[in-house]
Each structure stands twice: as structure tokens, then as C-alpha cells.
Amino acid sequence: MTNLTFYGAVNEIGGNKILLEDNGTKLFLDFGMSFGTANKYFSEFLQPRKCSGLGDFIEFGLLPDLQGVYRSDFIKHMGRPKEDLNIQGLLVSHAHADHASYINHLHEDLPIYCSDETYCILKALNDTSSSGFNDITDLSVCFETHVKDGKVIRTKGEKLDRKYKPFKFKEKFHIDEIEVEPYRVDHSLSGATGYIIHTSSGTIVYTGDFRFHGRREKETATFMEACKEAKPDVLIIEGTRVDSTNSKKELEVEDEICDISSKAKGLSICNWSVRDTDRMLSFLNAAKKLGKKLAISLKQAYLLDELAKCGDSIAPKTGDEDLTLYANRKSWGVIGDSNWCDKIRDEDYDSWERPYLDRAVCYKDIRANQKDYLMFCSNFDLKELIDIKPAEGSVYIKSVCEPFDAEMEMDWGRIMNWINHFGMNVESTHVSGHASGPQLKEFVEQVNAKNIIPLHTENAKAFENWSKNVTLLGKVGESYVL
């Protein structure tokens, strides 16, 4: 018998956590954060307590209270008896937080299966993040003590490598008796994967997040054809944009960026999702066409160098002559000041940032040559504008999704205050990382699964317009038996 239990993404977008059980083998499909549930109780300044281990997360339903799943140091600190690992693997569809950010809570010996690119992205996040994505690819054991001079004192715990098992697309592998076929799909970051999973009771397709309008749309079409040939018993499909008919292409965004920046009389300030290398390529190609340079953050440079190790064919390379690195002012803020030696400058930056500094530009370079640059500027980087002082005719190119909750509305209102303060125009161009309604309809009809379980959507009922075999989940924790 094969059983699926849905611990997240039920009647909401994100938070995928699906437990698959088949003849004694247990696998999780993704282990992400539910933004909706998390934002009900926590914020940037009100975070779950580390001292409670998993307790705060379990209290508010952010994590299921399961045995043999979570890291040993947290379990011990919570006063629970030792729990041996009783789950055989985690399949990660991609590296977005709503699918992967709670990996840091999982058992240190759990095998984690993902694409090479997904591992590289998670490693970059782990290495460069000050919070949130720590303990994703390695784990620092917490709450350790030792005895010195007859006294118990705290000690720094051992650092353990997590048990990642990166795979190649289209190469089948087994977890016990379960056979897994991973396929690349088009999404708004590299390495996104859809799975065809063969169990003792039948075949399951898990789409993860996907689309047909990016630079890898042919890969999604290949996955769809493979799913059709597999004749699945169950299709677990995302439905983020089930109500949308907009299927604008990524290449159209590239053209619009080029048009917007060509009209700018000053600096082109650009905001897109930091890990979306498809969008980064759109900005880079636009810069090339205009004879400009694209300035990206040091975090993005580190990510690109990690992706280069696994042979990502689409992500830009940090050696590209039209790509430059921008170093923010930090701590003492002496970068660009010749009165200070490199050693003092370097102390402002983390060890992973320092190798990039000698080839990075700073605010002085951008300020003096504003027409020559498209510059990445996340919400956290807005402070750089104080020193850059955007010239008259500068433009802010917004290339992210529209605000969809009150907190995002407040954030955008604050950003607009900065934009207005510096007298910049705002232009928008964006396409989603998710399939539109017509694209979802085509996928459902082509695959023709015996049963369909919509997930990662606020309107699962819409799928009933396309199939009579739809199972609607009512609440988190519900199960489905094949």
C-alpha cells in the first residue's frame, strides 16, 4: 500500500511537505516553509526561538510532530528521548524557500536527493546567508557542553556535512524499492525538477513548480511527454496561477528591459529575485545590446561561481566582460577610499566576499558613470543609493511579482518612498515562475492521470473544470491512499 500525507501547501501557495510511504519506505517530497502560516505568527523581528529547538515550529503548525525525522541536537535539547532516523530520503524539487528552507531542521543522516544545480544554489545560500538558510548543506551541532576543571561549560559543536546525493536529469535511481525519474523543468531558478515516482501501488507524478514560458520551456514539454507515457495513477500538480491567462515570455521581458534602459538618462536600477539567473541573463543581454554593463551583488557572483561548477549552461559567468561585481559599503565603509589599505578594507567583509573585492566596483564608480550601468539593487541594497546619488532621469526597473499581502504592500510603499526621494521613474516588467491556467490545463489533459491532486494553490477547485478525477484536500495532514 502507498500512502501520501500532505503537511503543507494545502489551499495555500508554498510550504510543500509531502510524506510518501510505500511498504516500509518513507520519503518526503520537499520540506519548505509555509509563508502564510509563518507570517501569521512571526516576522523579521519576531522569530521562533532557537532555544526551543523545534518546539515553536510545532506549536504553530509550521512543522509536523513526527518521530525519527528531525535533527538529534534539537530533539535532545527539547528533552525528548533519542530518535533513530526512520525516513529513507528527501526529494527536493528546487531551492526556493517554500520548498526547501526547513531542511535545516531535518535529521543529520537523512539522504537528500536533488539536482546538481539545486545543491549548488543551496550551498551558496548556506555559505552566504547570515540567517534563514543556515544548516542547509552542512550542520553545526548545537547545545554541546564539555567538562573542564570539574565544571560543565558550553562548547562549539561539531560541523557535519549533510548527506546530499545530487543526481543527473533523466537518470533513474532507487530508494529501496521505489524508482525515481527526475526531469528538468522550466522555473524561475536553475535546477528545478519534476519527478516520476514508481511505487508498489502505482506511479506518482510530482511537478514541483514549473512553467512553459521561460528559457527552458522545451524541458517542461519533455517532462510532460514522459509523464504522459508513464500513465500515472496520481498527478500532484502545482496551481499557483490557475486563474491567470497571462503567458508572456521571458524573452519579452528582455526586450522590455532593453527598451526601458535605452530611454534612461541616468542610472538603471534593477530589482529581480536574487537567485533568478534566467532574469539576470535577461538584464545582462539587455546591457550588452545597449553597450552597458550589468553590476550584480557579491552574493550573486558567489552563486554564479557555484553554478559554473555544475555546468549550468544558461546562468551568466562572472568572467563575462559585460558583467561587473558591485561591493556594498559595510561596517567602516572604506571601500573606494585610497586612504585605507586593502587589509582594513577587507575586514569589512566576510571571508567568502574578499576574493571578489579587487575586481569589484563601488558606489564611486557607479556615481561617476551612471549611464553606463544597469545595477542590481534589492530592497536591502537601497541604502547604496544615498552614496550613488542617482542622476536626473534615472529609472527603477521593477522585475518582481506584485505585492500579494499586507506586509508586501507595506514593503513596497517603503521602497516607493526611497524611489520618490531620489526622483526616479518606475517601470515594471516581469513574468512569473509558474504555469498559467491554460498551461496547467494542457498539462492535465496531456498527462491524463487517473487522479489529480492540486497543491500549492488557493483555487484547487478550478482543476475540476478540466478533469472529473480531482481530489480536493481539505486541510493540512490529510492523506491519500493509492
Regions found by a protein language model. Give the residues of each.
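Binuclear metal-dependent phosphoesterase catalytic core
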Residues: I13-G15, L473-L482
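Hard-cation-handling environments
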Residues: N246-E392
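Cap/insert and terminal regions of metallo-dependent hydrolase folds
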Residues: G214-K299, A391-S467
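Generic beta-strand/beta-sheet core signal
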Residues: Y7, D30, S115, Y183, ...
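His/Asp/Glu-rich metal-coordinating catalytic cores
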Residues: T2-E12, N16-G89, Y102-D278, S282, ...
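Short acidic-hydrophobic, aromatic-tinged amphipathic segments that line or gate anion-handling sites
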Residues: K163-F169, L325-R329, R354-D358, T471-G474
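Short, polar loop motifs at secondary-structure junctions
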Residues: H96-D98, N379-L382, H456-K461
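Histidine-centered divalent metal-coordination motifs
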Residues: G89-H99, H187, H456
